[in-house]
Curated annotation (Swiss-Prot):
PANTHER family: TRANSCRIPTION ELONGATION FACTOR GREA (PTHR30437:SF4). Belongs to the GreA/GreB family. Disulfide bonds: none annotated. One of its GO terms (molecular function) is DNA binding. Keywords: DNA-binding, Transcription, Transcription regulation. This is Transcription elongation factor GreA. GO terms for biological process: DNA-templated transcription elongation; regulation of DNA-templated transcription elongation. Gene3D superfamilies: Transcription elongation factor, GreA/GreB, C-terminal domain, Transcription elongation factor, GreA/GreB, N-terminal domain. Pfam families: GreA_GreB, GreA_GreB_N. NCBIfam families: greA, PRK00226.1-2, PRK00226.1-4, PRK00226.1-5. The keyword Transcription regulation applies. InterPro entries: GreA/GreB_C_sf, TF_GreA/GreB_CS, Tscrpt_elong_fac_GreA, Tscrpt_elong_fac_GreA/B, Tscrpt_elong_fac_GreA/B_C, Tscrpt_elong_fac_GreA/B_fam, Tscrpt_elong_fac_GreA/B_N, Tscrpt_elong_fac_GreA/B_N_sf.
């Protein structure tokens, strides 16, 4: 069984999305399909086909979330030893050694990642290059733009 690392907040967000899909979206789509059926010929009924397609997307997302919750490995970074190492769930301040630009990222699960909000996936090239390193260490990270060198300025266990 595949394991899906996630923060407690990410786990709660997936549970909320699953509840929304099952209790609100699924019944709404079912009602739309029933209403579209009443309009007659299903072969040329665009509303019916659109609702069926929407139903397929909804059911696929439900299955995806259920699989992820079933294999969830909830990691609360506040309970981990605070030894200055970069691990899942921490925020890390890094400095690009060429440009001296500082950025802060929180390392989270795949479903929680939001680059614009400063949350990067544990499976991203940046996170993979930082995990296991400590404050003051340098990391050479292969990015789509080439190799970038960063210095780890601070690790925050939040």
């Amino acid at each position: 069984m595949q394991r899906y690392p996630m923060t407690p907040q990410g786990h709660a967000a997936l549970e909320a999305e699953l509840k929304q899909l099952k209790s609100i979206d699924r019944p709404r789509i079912t009602a739309s399909i029933a209403e579209a059926r009443e309009h007659g010929d299903l072969k040329e009924n665009a509303e019916y086909h659109a609702a069926r397609e929407q139903q397929g997307f909804c059911e696929a997302r439900i299955r995806d979330i259920e699989a992820k919750l079933g294999g969830a490995q909830v990691i609360d970074p506040t309970t981990l030893p605070k030894d200055g190492r970069v691990i899942f769930g921490v925020s890390v301040v890094i400095e690009n050694m060429d440009t001296e630009e500082e950025k802060q990222y929180k390392i989270v699960g795949d479903d929680e990642a939001d680059f614009k909000a400063g949350k990067i996936s544990v499976n991203s090239p940046i996170a993979r290059g930082l995990i296991g390193k400590s404050e003051g260490d340098e990391a050479r990270i292969e990015t789509p733009k080439g190799v970038v060198e960063y210095e780890i300025m601070k690790v925050i266990y939040d």
